[in-house]
């Protein structure tokens, strides 16, 4: 995505109206809406490309939220492909026991990413900053993907 597309997608995702985004950027609502559509098309293609590269079967795609739910038949688990304007595209595999991961550097990076994504998506994480990042991932992704826990 271009920088303008990232900006428009991010501002609209933060809950601002097209008119407010247009005013903030010094442009028109028509420009904002066209840019949003172009951004969502590029984001859809990028999420699908990431899913294909990771051998995932796509179950759900929501470019407005920057998320794709997939399934990896080889390892028999769900996977979530996410997009963040700050961190780009990431692939997350859905494990039943995320607390088993103990690598401190990886867990720190994961926590930063998840907290940033929760902030971008307006997901409340009050009191969640001290829980294991694997559990935090389950909570954040469950907010973004209906029915993920099943």
Regions found by a protein language model. Give the residues of each.
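Short Lys/Arg-enriched helix C-cap and helix-to-coil transition segments
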Residues: 43-59
């Amino acid at each position: 995505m271009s920088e303008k597309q990232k900006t428009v997608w991010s501002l609209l995702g933060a809950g601002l109206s097209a008119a407010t985004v247009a005013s903030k950027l010094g442009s028109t609502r028509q420009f904002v809406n066209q840019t949003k559509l172009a951004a969502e098309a590029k984001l859809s293609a990028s999420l699908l490309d990431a899913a294909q590269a990771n051998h995932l079967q796509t179950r759900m795609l929501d470019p407005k939220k920057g998320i794709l739910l997939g399934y990896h038949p080889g390892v028999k688990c769900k996977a979530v492909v996410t997009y963040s304007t700050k961190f780009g595209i990431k692939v997350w595999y859905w494990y039943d026991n995320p607390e088993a991961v103990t690598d401190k550097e990886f867990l720190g990076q994961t926590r930063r990413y998840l907290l940033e994504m929760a902030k971008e998506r307006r997901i409340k994480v009050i009191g969640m900053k001290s829980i294991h990042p694997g559990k935090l991932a389950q909570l954040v992704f469950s907010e973004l993907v209906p029915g993920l826990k099943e």
